[in-house]
Amino acid sequence: MKALSAIVRRELIAYFSSPLAYIVMAAFLLLQGALFALIVGYLSQPGQSSMSILQAFFGGTIFFWFFLVVAPLITMRLVAEERRSGTIEILLTAPVTETQVITGKFVAALVFYLSLWLPTLIYVFIVKTQASVDWGAVAASYLGVALFGALFVSLGLFASTLTRNQIIAAVIAFTGLIVLFGVPLVRGLMVSSTWLAAAVDHADLWQHMADYSKGIVDTRHVVYELSLTGLFIFLSTKSLELAKWR
């Protein structure tokens, strides 16, 4: 446990001492603020959707574009940079396992990712001053944010174990996220296979987040996201083990 906490602490220090981290945080909050202002302005117009502001904020399409960019940026250096600089060999000669290294890096990246979302709580209280807030839906929305973050960080971490180049790692992660988001597009091609179409519907991340934003927590969605997260952490560990012997 001490080894794991040491790795988490090491990675968090690396994050918060990097100029890129603050650039990502500033850009993320600026875009989130702009999105919130646009949603408030749009829904305040007469005759617009009865959807709540927070539901539109968390369940809207633009929400996903943040993930496509942010997740690769915060994970691309995790292993790729250490492999390039040779520090991964030094780390693995310490009394730690590959599993501890991967888990520690995953936890640190997830903590950093979640820290990006903490300031958005301000928007919840802004809405509360003007209208009633469904706290169940708010809690479910942030649960969705955390689950999606865990999934996308684990995918980005896996991408980072596959190369020594941070940019290539980011491109691989970005491509992987496009594939995950693109699952619903396959739905229209499955006319005859009802069971396959149902499976695709179950893997529709857009619908998952739309449900979370409404306060609907489907355990199948939770299991799906946690299962994929576990799979990518497992693959990251195995990839690091293979890299150790190259």
Predicted regions span which residues?
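Aromatic- and glycine-rich beta-strand/loop motifs that create alpha-glucan
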Residues: M1-M25
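Hydrophobic alpha-helical transmembrane segments of multi-pass membrane transport/permease proteins
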Residues: P19-G41, I62-A71, T175-V179
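Hydrophobic alpha-helical transmembrane segments in multi-pass membrane proteins
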Residues: Y22, A26, W65, A108-F125, ...
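Secretory targeting signals
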Residues: A34-A37, L54-G59, V107-I167
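Terminal transmembrane helical anchor/hairpin motif
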Residues: G41-L54, T175-S239, R246
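Long, hydrophobic alpha-helical segments
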Residues: F58-E81, L116
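Short alpha-helical transmembrane interface motifs in multi-pass membrane proteins
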Residues: G60, L68-L73, A108, G136-S141, ...
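Helix-loop-helix units of permease transmembrane domains in multi-pass membrane transporters
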Residues: L78-A108
